[in-house]
Amino acid sequence: ADGSDPVGGESLPDTGGAR
């Protein structure tokens, strides 16, 4: 996932809710 919000199912703060 790509983004800046900790949303999307991943635990990293670099994940986005897009994926």
From Swiss-Prot:
Conversion of fibrinogen to fibrin is triggered by thrombin, which cleaves fibrinopeptides A and B from alpha and beta chains, and thus exposes the N-terminal polymerization sites responsible for the formation of the soft clot. The soft clot is converted into the hard clot by factor XIIIA which catalyzes the epsilon-(gamma-glutamyl)lysine cross-linking between gamma chains (stronger) and between alpha chains (weaker) of different monomers. GO terms for cellular component: extracellular region. It is found in: Secreted. The keyword Secreted applies. GO terms for biological process: adaptive immune response; blood coagulation; innate immune response. Keywords: Adaptive immunity, Blood coagulation, Coiled coil, Disulfide bond, Hemostasis, Immunity, Innate immunity, Secreted. Heterohexamer; disulfide linked. Contains 2 sets of 3 non-identical chains (alpha, beta and gamma). The 2 heterotrimers are in head to head conformation with the N-termini in a small central domain. Cleaved by the protease thrombin to yield monomers which, together with fibrinogen beta (FGB) and fibrinogen gamma (FGG), polymerize to form an insoluble fibrin matrix. Fibrin has a major function in hemostasis as one of the primary components of blood clots. In addition, functions during the early stages of wound repair to stabilize the lesion and guide cell migration during re-epithelialization. Was originally thought to be essential for platelet aggregation, based on in vitro studies using anticoagulated blood. A long coiled coil structure formed by 3 polypeptide chains connects the central nodule to the C-terminal domains (distal nodules). The long C-terminal ends of the alpha chains fold back, contributing a fourth strand to the coiled coil structure. This is Fibrinogen alpha chain.
